[in-house]
Curated annotation (Swiss-Prot):
<feature type="binding site">
    <location>
        <position position="409"/>
    </location>
    <ligand>
        <name>substrate</name>
    </ligand>
</feature>
<feature type="binding site">
    <location>
        <position position="217"/>
    </location>
    <ligand>
        <name>Ca(2+) 3</name>
    </ligand>
</feature>
<feature type="binding site">
    <location>
        <position position="109"/>
    </location>
    <ligand>
        <name>Ca(2+) 2</name>
    </ligand>
</feature>
<feature type="domain" description="CBM20">
    <location>
        <begin position="609"/>
        <end position="719"/>
    </location>
</feature>
<comment type="function">
    <text>Converts starch into maltose.</text>
</comment>
<feature type="binding site">
    <location>
        <position position="81"/>
    </location>
    <ligand>
        <name>Ca(2+) 1</name>
    </ligand>
</feature>
<dbReference type="Pfam" id="PF00686">
    <property type="entry name" value="CBM_20"/>
</dbReference>
<feature type="binding site">
    <location>
        <position position="110"/>
    </location>
    <ligand>
        <name>Ca(2+) 2</name>
    </ligand>
</feature>
<keyword id="KW-0326">Glycosidase</keyword>
<dbReference type="InterPro" id="IPR002909">
    <property type="entry name" value="IPT_dom"/>
</dbReference>
<dbReference type="InterPro" id="IPR013784">
    <property type="entry name" value="Carb-bd-like_fold"/>
</dbReference>
<feature type="domain" description="IPT/TIG">
    <location>
        <begin position="532"/>
        <end position="608"/>
    </location>
</feature>
<feature type="binding site">
    <location>
        <position position="56"/>
    </location>
    <ligand>
        <name>Ca(2+) 1</name>
    </ligand>
</feature>
<keyword id="KW-0119">Carbohydrate metabolism</keyword>
<dbReference type="GO" id="GO:0005975">
    <property type="term" value="P:carbohydrate metabolic process"/>
</dbReference>
<keyword id="KW-0479">Metal-binding</keyword>
<feature type="binding site">
    <location>
        <position position="259"/>
    </location>
    <ligand>
        <name>substrate</name>
    </ligand>
</feature>
């Protein structure tokens, strides 16, 4: 009995020591993939399937698309043999790395022929059939097996989905490639050249001005090789339904989420209606690629508006640009990094849903910008401890380099588990899993100069303090550092892996210390919660009856209650840190979610209840009054989706919709997501360049929205 008591005491003291000063080890066996919507504590690993690992050589040169494989791996735009089975075989490696979500490049059937010399759809972004798996990668059985095994290893699967376009074509050569051909589970639908009566594609030429919203969304992508990508018309009911069915099929096969390609290049109304239909099937995670449009550029507000209103989260290109400038080219300082953290925190309603990254398949790898591995380690440490969920491009932990496409898409060179980067990622993955401050917490700058950034993440009483010195030649004396860490001594969570040190804290002050050249130090504290604490509600948009996941702490093991705007929700499942509930039947609009457990209520978290199942509608107003440079036309109406008569155009949730486009001036149009089969009232207004508002005259327009996948509502401006 005395031995048992002593063992218990020693174990308790060791646990307390870990809480205050060291690393809580990452236990991959404790990971779970039960909640598709929840990625706050995850590390995402982005994989180009063809370039990861060849697990099945029998599909390298399939009969359906014979001759597209290059066994020498010297032709960078040919297939090189990676497949779904290869990803499955490397799940143990990914699990050891601490990965809890994999993001797969597009898996659906791609172009069966060459698009010019030695140019194939190896990357997956030239989809010809959205209902079949690409034969170089496997089949639906292979996909299902991968998803099942990933889930068994506590790893979620996000699939890249490409609804903007089909395949390459040349407007002056109908024999080139497949002419943009589209298939539905093997049945031919049409191509760019036999589309006169179908309207499956946009026929407005190629994009020349990428900052022009009309061109970017209603014209074709162009490729440096001299061809175009056939731009799909999401306003066409057949296409909208086809794409929606394809996305639903992926979810039905177990996908935990979708990364939606090129969301800035098709109308946002389709995005929102697609998200709604997917969320009705399952509480999954959706993230869109809105490339570029950083703060200060022409369409930055449109990106923010999209992220706040569409129900689709976005990849954080704003922060990515600054990360690469701060740690890569050194053209910006730590002040710029802190400023961007603050700006995005103010602009994005759900900043914790942003996906952060240092590089990806569309830009040069970090080590080709800066070959110093120490700076790579610093950049990784930042995204692994900052707000949002980090996405690590395959091979980064193996120090892969490579310039722009296609040279950033080399074959995975090794699966070495001893590299410093591998150890860094696996260790900080444990921190993300075990400390709610990283998953949900606020960010506060605690000490800064051009080279050093010390920031604190805090969620109630959980705290993580991070210090990064990007200067690999100079150390810095750190004094006057304040923190929310409790009194005590704290070891570096990374155990000195990146040159870090321990600290002592007394009454909110950190004893002076020297931060070594190039060093990264991480100190953390976590404790049990005495009251329910909501960190996240996901998805953050949907209709009554949908399932949503509430993540946080202190919910207890005895079921309490969850309310949406005071209306009690039915609980599906309840654990101490995760609750699943059904959205209650209540009025549409932004509402507050609250958890009550043990008679104590939580903090509030916003959720957007839709007015009903969504459909995307082309709203056109003809013969609008003359406008001048800087004037914009918006739509508002009597439902939250149209702003509830608001003239706020800031990009906040449920504000006025727009701005509209005018390729046929003075007629204006855009596509908005509204509840299907509902009678609505609406009006248009002009927001002049000086901020003044000019409303339409006359009575409100009244219309009943369509019940199908898409529709059109056209009115004339009332003078």
């Amino acid at each position: 009995m005395k031995k048992k008591t002593l063992s218990l005491f020693v174990g308790l003291m060791l646990l307390i020591g870990l809480l205050f000063s060291g690393s809580l080890p990452y236990n991959p066996n404790a990971a779970e993939a039960s909640s598709s919507a929840s990625v706050k504590g995850d590390v995402i690993y982005q994989i180009i399937i063809d370039r990861f690992y060849d697990g099945d050589t029998t599909n390298n040169n399939p009969a359906k698309s014979y001759g597209l494989y290059d066994p020498t791996k010297s032709k960078w735009k040919m297939y090189w043999g990676g497949d779904l089975e290869g990803v499955r075989q490397k799940l143990p490696y990914l699990k050891q790395l601490g990965v809890t979500t994999i993001w797969l490049s597009p898996v659906l059937d791609n172009l069966d022929t060459l698009a010019g010399t030695d140019n194939t759809g190896y990357h997956g972004y030239w989809t010809r059939d959205f209902k079949q798996i690409e034969e170089h990668f496997g089949n639906w059985t292979t996909f299902d097996t991968l998803v099942n095994d990933a889930h068994q290893n506590g790893i979620k699967v996000i699939v890249d989905f490409v609804p903007n376009h089909s395949t390459p074509f040349k407007a002056n050569d109908s024999t080139f490639a497949e002419g943009g051909a589209l298939y539905n589970n093997g049945t031919y639908m049409g191509n760019y050249f036999d589309d006169a009566t179908k309207g499956y594609f946009h026929h407005n030429g190629d994009i020349s001005n990428w900052d022009d919203r009309y061109e970017a969304q209603w014209k074709n992508f162009t490729d440096p090789a001299g061809f175009s990508l056939a731009d799909l018309s999401q306003e066409n009911g057949t296409i909208a339904q086809y794409l929606t069915d394809a996305a639903v099929q992926l979810v039905a096969h177990g996908a935990d989420g979708l990364r939606i390609d090129a969301v800035k290049h098709f109308n946002s109304g389709f995005s929102k209606s697609l998200a709604d239909k997917l969320y009705q099937k399952k509480d999954i995670f959706l993230v869109g690629e809105w490339y570029g449009d950083d703060p200060g550029t022409a369409n930055h507000l449109e990106k923010v508006r999209y992220a706040n209103n569409s129900g689709v989260n976005v990849l954080d290109f704003d922060l990515n640009t600054v990360i690469r400038n701060v740690f890569g080219t050194f053209t910006q300082t730590m002040y710029d990094l802190n400023n961007m953290v603050n700006q995005t925190g103010n602009e994005y309603k759900y900043k914790e849903n942003l996906i952060t990254f240092i590089d990806n398949h569309d830009m040069s790898r970090f080590l080709s910008v800066n070959s110093n591995k120490a700076n790579l380690h610093q950049a990784l440490a930042f995204i692994l401890t900052s707000r949002g969920t980090p996405s690590i491009y395959y091979g980064t932990e193996q120090y892969m380099a490579g310039g722009n496409d296609p040279y950033n898409r080399g074959m995975m060179p090794a699966f070495d588990t001893t590299t410093t980067a591998f150890k860094e990622v696996s260790t900080l993955a444990g921190l993300r899993r075990n400390n709610a401050a990283i998953q949900y917490g606020t960010t506060t700058q605690r000490w800064i100069n051009n080279d050093v950034y010390i920031y604190e993440r805090k969620f109630f009483n959980d705290v993580v303090l991070v210090a990064i010195n990007r200067n690999t030649q100079s150390s810095y004396s750190i004094s006057g550092l304040q923190t929310a860490l409790p009194n005590g001594s704290y070891a570096d969570y990374l155990s000195g892996l990146l040159g870090g040190n321990g600290i002592s804290v007394s009454n909110g002050s950190v004893a002076s210390f020297t931060l070594a050249p190039g060093a990264v130090s991480v100190w953390q504290y976590s404790t049990s919660a005495s009251a329910p604490q909501i960190g996240s509600v996901a998805p953050n948009m949907g209709i009554p009856g949908n399932v949503v996941t509430i993540d946080g702490k202190g919910f207890g093991t005895t079921q309490g209650t969850v309310t949406f705007g005071g209306v009690t929700a039915t609980v599906k499942s309840w654990t101490s840190n995760r609750i699943e509930v059904y959205v209650p039947n209540m009025a549409a609009g932004l509402t507050d979610v609250k958890v009550t457990a043990g008679g104590v209520s939580s903090n509030l978290y916003s959720y957007n209840i839709l007015s009903g199942t969504q459909t995307s509608v082309v709203f056109t107003v003809k013969s609008a009054p003359p406008t001048n440079l800087g004037d914009k036309i918006y739509l508002t109406g009597n439902i939250p989706e149209l702003g509830n008569w608001s003239t706020d155009t800031s990009g906040a949730v449920n504000n006025a919709q727009g701005p509209l486009l005018a390729p046929n001036y003075p007629d204006w149009f855009y596509v908005f997501s509204v509840p299907a089969g509902k009678t609505i009232q609406f009006k248009f207004f002009i927001k002049r360049a000086d901020g003044t508002i000019q409303w339409e005259n006359g009575s409100n327009h009244v219309a009943t929205t369509p019940t199908g996948a898409t529709g059109n509502i056209t009115v004339t401006w009332q003078n």
